[in-house]
C-alpha cells in the first residue's frame, strides 16, 4: 500500500490535507491557431520553431491572465505528420521536434508557469486501445517498444528544461474492466518500465477519461504495488458527481492519493462551480485544474479555442 508520507507532487510547499486549497491551474496548450474546428496545422510542439514569437506571446498572455500550470501533448504515430501528430518511428521524435519540446518548456517557465504535465497521445496503430486479438505478438511488442522508447528518450529533454513536470504516460490510457487483454498488458508493461527506470515522482501514471470511476477498480492491476503519487482525471459535465464517485472509488481500493483534473471545459463557470463545491467534502486534495480548449456548447469535436487565454471562471472559484 502507498504510504501517505510518500505522497509528494513536484510543487514547492505542497499541502497534503484534503481541505487544502487547490493550487492555481491553467490550460492544455496544444495549438497556437485554429481554423473553424481544424487544429491540425497548428500544433505547438510540431511547429514551435516556425511560430516561436506567436507561442511566446500567447504564453505571456495566459500567464498574465493568472494561469500557472500547463499540459502539453505529444501527439504521435509511427508514420504520421499532420502539424499536430508527430512521427515517432524508431522510438523518438525528429530532432527539430525534440528541440521544440525543450524550447517550449523553457519558454513556459520564462513566462511564469511553475509546472507542466507532458501527456503522451499515441495514435493510429500506436494506440493500444485500437489493438485487436487476445495474444501479444511481435507486432504489438514492436509498437510497445516504440512508445516506451519515445518516453525514455524524451525524459532527459524534459528534465533539461529545468521546470517542474509530471508525465502522463498515455492520455486516458487506463483500460476499463471490459477492455482488451492487450490494452491491459500494454499499460501494465509500460508502467513497470517507467516506474522502475524513472521512479514515481515525475508522473501521474495514465490519465483517466471523463465518467471513468468504474476504471478505478483496474488501478491495482495496472500499477500493482507501486502506484503513482498523484492521479489525473478528466471531467466533462456533472463534475461534482464525478468527483464524489472518484473519491469513493479510490477509497474502496485504499488509494490515499490526491488528484489533478487534467481536462475540463474551457473557462466554464458551471464546471468551475461544480468542482469547487465538491472539493471540501472529499477525502483527498484536488491539487489543480487544467482546462481543455473546447467550450461546452461547441459543435467542434476536439478544439475550438486557440490560444486558451481565459481562465477567469476557474480563478474566481479558487482553482
Where are these regions (language model features)?
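Substrate-binding cleft of secreted/luminal carbohydrate-active enzymes
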Residues: 235-238, 255-319
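Aromatic-lined substrate-binding rim segments of carbohydrate-active enzymes
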Residues: 52-126, 148-151, 155, 183-204
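Structural preference for beta-strand elements that scaffold enzyme active sites
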Residues: 22-26, 69-71, 115-117, 164-168, ...
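Surface-exposed, active-site-proximal loop segments in enzymatic domains
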Residues: 35-47, 76-99, 124-142, 302-306
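Active-site groove signature of glycoside hydrolases
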Residues: 117-133, 148-181
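N-terminal carbohydrate-binding accessory modules
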Residues: 18-69, 310-317
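Acidic-and-aromatic substrate-binding clefts and catalytic sites of carbohydrate-active enzymes
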Residues: 47-53, 78-80, 92-98, 124-126, ...
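Glycoside hydrolase catalytic-domain groove-lining segments
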Residues: 180-275
